[in-house]
Amino acid sequence: MSLPMNSLYSLTWGDYGTSLVSAIQLLRCHGDLVDCTLAAGGRSFPAHKIVLCAASPFLLDLLKNTPCKHPVVMLAGVNANDLEALLEFVYRGEVSVDHAQLPSLLQAAQCLNIQGLAPQTVTKDDYTTHSIQLQHMIPQHHDQDQLIATIATAPQQTVHAQVVEDIHHQGQILQATTQTNAAGQQQTIVTTDAAKHDQAVIQAFLPARKRKPRVKKMSPTAPKISKVEGMDTIMGTPTSSHGSGSVQQVLGENGAEGQLLSSTPIIKSEGQKVETIVTMDPNNMIPVTSANAATGEITPAQGATGSSGGNTSGVLSTPKAKRAKHPPGTEKPRSRSQSEQPATCPICYAVIRQSRNLRRHLELRHFAKPGVKKEKKTTSGKKSSSGSSGSGSGALSSSGSVPQVQTVQSLHTLQGVQVKKDPDAQQQQQQQQQQQQQQQQAMTVSGATGGQVQQQVQQVQQQVQQQQQQQQQQQQQLQHHQIIDSSGNITTATTSAQAAAAAQQQAAGQQQQLVAQSDGSESGAPLSIAQVQTLQGHQIIGNLNQVNMTDFQQQQPQQQQQQQQQQQQQQQQQQQTQQTL
């Protein structure tokens, strides 16, 4: 018997269902070809889109509108253990759970509309209700009536899906919100981002833990607003620099036990930056002040019932540039800049009320520059005064042996001018006096032989050269002091060190002449050297003023007496040495 040519052969895979289920389970265990991730309770579970869509119409509508290759579905309000059990049920068709976990598992299955676990399935056509059989899930030691009663008392839920575009990530964020009638609110958020890793996205969208509401610290002078039971409060915050505001409405629920909702808008504009943070506490409502960066003002938020006086708009105006006046007792805390804060002087440790005055304090108290004073004390402690204004001599002289200060008259008369003498000139004068005494001692010693005379002449020459070098240094170091009298004239005052040096040179020249003449014809060459040296002294003396000559003549007798005494002492010493020899 032959078969027809158009007959079809039926090939049957005996264990098709078992083999396919086992193959899908292996792919899931090894993580191969997974194209989506479910996350809940801080854990993530890789899965396959085709399996999830076949098991849940809700996930089918959610994932087919997602162009992302590997979306990450965040399930808020679903326990991680329940999600793991649901995936086990989807991939294997059965799951074993504890009796305590069964209500939460069935509630999660109802939220996700998992086929085979949802007790009721609502269609869009005729809204008919289909019952499902749960006998295969109920163990023998559980009561069937009790389980069905538990499922019946669970709140009915309605699922809504919404698609939101995200421009920054160039993708789509699918947001699904599950609302309940009496048990509160539950949210299921689906996010897609191909650029980020799955784990990073999971950590970013983990469900937030319950924390205490943050209340920004305020100054003790800031006003506080307490909550009034059964009252609806309307808060207004500025949204732009033109004064237009957005109204934040806080609604009360269930009478006195209302739930306060707050928002934290951040508004940025070109002219100024305003940041408003409002935090409400059911027991003590303390609004956080809004800081204006442009004007530097701090504006505390106030309720409409206390500040608007019956105005239902709920918009609070923000001052722009000027500070608004407030009645006494309600002043706003002023923001103090760094320059207005107190500072401490690092030298005297004085407290300055404003830090901008610290520099002025240092300049006046610690680093003040000495100005021109009218009167200055001399080193001897005595003040030298000028003569009478009618005489107009203007010559000042001290009581010392050497003239210390010499003034040059100006065209106008000086009134009450006093000059401080130069300490450097005094030291130079003392050195010159010592050198002069040594010269006198060397010149008074007369030797019997010509060799001693030549040695004396050489010593005198060396001393004269030293004096010339000192005079050059003195001329470089001399300073001219400017003196301003009462009439506004400026005169110059010079020290009399130059006059004293010239007088000393003259005395040295005279002494050299005496020594050369006392030597006689035996020392002809030294005589000519002494004469040449005295010529320089005569030239310097000829350039001196008459005042210097008078001062020198007054001092000359004293110097001669000193020289005679020194000569006598030297002669006595020579006689003693000769006697000893």
UniProtKB/Swiss-Prot annotation:
Residues 381-401 have a biased composition (Low complexity). Transcriptional activator that functions by regulating chromatin structure. Overcomes the repressive effects of chromatin by promoting the open chromatin conformation in promoter gene regions, thereby allowing access to other transcription factors. Binds to DNA Polycomb response elements (PREs) at the bithorax complex and to the proximal region of the engrailed promoter, and positively regulates transcription of many genes including homeotic ones. The keyword Metal-binding applies. Interacts with Bin1, lolal, corto, ttk and ph-p. Interacts with FACT subunits Ssrp and dre4/SPT16. Interacts with E(bx). Upon ecdysone stimulation, interacts with Nup98. Its main location: nucleus. Expressed in the central nervous system throughout development. GO terms for cellular component: euchromatin; nucleus; pericentric heterochromatin; polytene chromosome; protein-containing complex. GO terms for biological process: amyloid fibril formation; cell division; chromatin organization; chromatin remodeling; heterochromatin formation; imaginal disc-derived wing morphogenesis; maternal-to-zygotic transition of gene expression; negative regulation of DNA-templated transcription. SMART domains: BTB. PANTHER family: BTB DOMAIN TRANSCRIPTION FACTOR, TRANSCRIPTION FACTOR GAGA. It comes from Drosophila melanogaster. The N-terminal BTB domain mediates protein oligomerization. The C-terminal glutamine-rich region is required for transcriptional activation activity. Keywords: Activator, Cell cycle, Cell division, Chromatin regulator, Chromosome, Developmental protein, Differentiation, DNA-binding, Metal-binding, Mitosis, Nucleus, Oogenesis, Phosphoprotein, Repressor, Transcription, Transcription regulation, Zinc, Zinc-finger. CDD domains: BTB_POZ_BAB-like. The keyword Flavoprotein does not apply. The N-terminus is blocked. Residues 34-99 form the BTB domain. Residues 201-397 are annotated as: Interaction with E(bx). A zinc finger (C2H2-type) spans 343-366. This is Transcription activator GAGA.
